[in-house]
Amino acid sequence: MSEDIRRGPGRPPKKRVVPNFERKGILEKPVRPQSRLEFSYDNPLIFKNLFIYFKNLKSKNILVRCTPTEITFFSRDQSQASFVIATIDGKNVNHYYASDVFWLGINRELVEKMFNSIDRSFLKITIVHRYDKPETLYFIFTDFDIDKECTYQITVSEPELDMDLIEMEKSISEERLKNYPLRWEFTSKQLKKTFSDLSNYTELVTIEKLGGDTPLHLYFQKFNSISYHEMYKSSNKINLTSTIPKSQVFQINVKIAHIKSLASAMVTDKIRILCEENGNLIFQSEMDALMLNTITMNNMI
């Protein structure tokens, strides 16, 4: 601030001291002896954004799978055409412990209300599931500025597993992801604008790319009516990569309504899009330790 400019009346802003949290990752033993699950993480707003995404998609029930190495959230959108799989690797958080592999069922609306009350004053979230209270999941939020701890006890159930949803996890296995023939990145703003504009004219759009160093091409054409072409000529500007041989053409038809609803629901600035030969799309985004995957089944059209 210039010496000629004086601060107005009032108390100067207090500089917040943020604790230095060590990320120890996976523990061999829990901190609390009765814990079947312990999850401690210094970024509670990631969970708030995740449940905003579930709300935007109008998901209902959420399956939670806990394993000794990671915690994963599974759900569907309202249309049943998109499958959400969100994973946090235990090695990337402050501490994580799960005794074995087990599943919990939680109601999205119930948990969403809890996260709506969480703001930036809370610097840590701890999730605990205990052997002696299997029907309860504890969410503990800590505000270190005033040494406040808020604990919510949410009723959970042993869920009926949605095997079709769980099976979709194979689509995002490390080996499978290497073999997708086409991928690129959009900002959430670009994704929303492209599919919102297209929805004014057509229900289907074609995604096309020739083999070699050629542009990404999105288009539609209505006989004796209107056509539209959207070309991305600089592959580096959208991180476009492909494994399409030079002599071949990759082409799929996508139902715009599916993508438009996803684009409106997104809670991250950047989205990676991967295409399968069968027409399915995967939308990937990252929020700190969270990897968010949404698989859209365009072969259902």
Curated annotation (Swiss-Prot):
Keywords assigned? Host-virus interaction, Inhibition of host innate immune response by virus, Inhibition of host IRF3 by virus, Inhibition of host RLR pathway by virus, Late protein, Viral immunoevasion
Concerning what turns on (or off) its expression, the entry says:
Expressed in the late phase of the viral replicative cycle.
Could you provide one GO biological process annotation from this protein's UniProt record? symbiont-mediated suppression of host cytoplasmic pattern recognition receptor signaling pathway via inhibition of IRF3 activity
Q: Does the keyword Cytoplasm apply?
A: no
The record, for InterPro entries, names: DNA_clamp_sf (IPR046938)
Quaternary state and interactors: Interacts with host IRF3.
Query: What's this chain's function?
Result: Plays a role in the inhibition of host innate immune system by acting as a negatively regulator of type I interferon production. Mechanistically, interacts with and prevents host IRF3 nuclear localization to inhibit its transcriptional activity.
UniProt-recorded name of the protein: Uncharacterized protein E301R
Q: Which organism is it from?
A: African swine fever virus (isolate Tick/Malawi/Lil 20-1/1983)
